[in-house]
A protein has these predicted regions:
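Bacterial Sec-dependent N-terminal signal peptides
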Residues: 16-47, 52, 137
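Short, low-complexity N-terminal intrinsically disordered segments enriched in polar/charged residues
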Residues: 135-162, 172
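Short solvent-exposed beta->alpha transition segments
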Residues: 167-222
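Proline-centered linker/hinge motifs at extracellular inter-domain junctions
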Residues: 43-44, 149, 261
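Solvent-exposed loop segments of extracellular immunoglobulin-like
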Residues: 73-80
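Extracellular acidic, Ser/Thr/Pro-rich low-complexity tracts
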Residues: 67-72, 117
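Exposed beta-sheet edge and beta->alpha loop/turn motif
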Residues: 213-285
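Surface-exposed, flexible coil segments in extracellular/virion-facing regions
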Residues: 82-98
Length: 285
């Protein structure tokens, strides 16, 4: 509102002017700029590396994580390591993992890592905040090789001792890369045609694993009692229906291929029994 008043006085004109507007404040505040809140970026797990991609139970594997963080020194981050089996030794970004005897094998195990960053929040709420990230390592192939090799040997010989099990089924755990697979199939076919096993006993004696971890040797004390069902012409020592027993050591070899153990060959070392010399092979040694 503006008010003007003219005061006459000998040719002098005075003007009184008051300026303003209804309801306005002479000093209105400007817009308020909120404080800038710093953004804390989460840690980044760049890699998790194991000292071995294949391991035996009750041996240590070193697991190392490479982690970076823009705000917090990596040594101040919290690292939590987990696996479906085994224990961890150490702390921080590098630990040792050991799987116990009795863990299921052969199997693939992945190591899981949780990294936690705790920091002070620079906002109106204040207090501590957390960034949590998870990562998983490439799998580690775990074995209990002596047990696996012993199980393969006993399973094969147990199938051989059961005359109702086909030759093809008996050799399912033999490697295609070993000539022993074809030889063993022919031997079992011969046995099935000429004998019926009526009793057996098997006892695992020894298992050794090669220094390179790629070969194995097994010895099983074996005893088979069988009845002759067919004789070849000219075999004067053979009598259909005769029952006899062969006993000695069944010696087997194995190879490691395609991330597992396979049988490679099987041979019998024992005394020959008249009429049963061809029990294990059509070409007895």
């Amino acid at each position: 509102m503006t008010v003007g008043r003219i005061l006459p006085a000998a040719g002098l004109v005075l003007a009184l002017i008051v300026s303003g507007s209804c309801g306005s404040s002479p000093m209105s505040p400007g817009p308020v700029t909120p404080p800038v809140t710093a953004v804390n970026t989460p840690p980044v797990v760049e890699s998790i590396v194991a000292s071995a991609t294949r391991a035996e139970v009750e041996t240590d594997v070193t697991i190392t994580a490479t982690v970076r963080d823009a705000e917090t020194p990596v040594a101040q981050l919290k690292y939590e390591w987990r696996a479906d089996a085994g224990t961890f030794t150490g702390e921080g970004a590098s630990v040792r993992w050991r799987a116990p005897k009795g863990a299921p094998t052969p199997a693939d195990y992945a190591i899981r890592l949780t990294v936690t960053e705790t920091y002070s929040a620079s906002n109106a709420v204040g207090g501590s905040q957390q960034n949590i990230v998870n990562a998983t390592s490439p799998v580690i192939r775990l074995h209990d090789s002596p047990k696996e090799l012993g199980d393969l040997s006993m399973s094969f010989l147990g199938d051989f001792a059961n005359s109702s099990v086909s030759p093809s089924t008996c050799i399912r755990d033999f490697s295609d890369s070993c000539r022993g697979k074809a030889d063993e199939k022919a031997d079992i076919e011969w046995n099935r045609e000429h004998f019926v096993v009526v009793g057996s006993s098997l006892r695992l004696q020894n298992v050794t694993v090669g220094a390179n971890g790629m070969t194995g040797n097994m010895s099983v004390a074996c005893r088979f009692t069988s009845r002759i069902t067919k004789c070849e012409p000219g075999d004067s020592g053979c009598a259909v229906g005769a029952v006899g027993t062969v006993a000695g050591d069944c010696r087997l070899t194995a190879v490691y291929e395609q991330q597992r153990w396979w049988l490679c060959s099987s041979n019998f070392d024992g005394a020959q029994v008249p009429g049963f010399r061809s029990f294990f092979s059509s070409k007895p040694k």
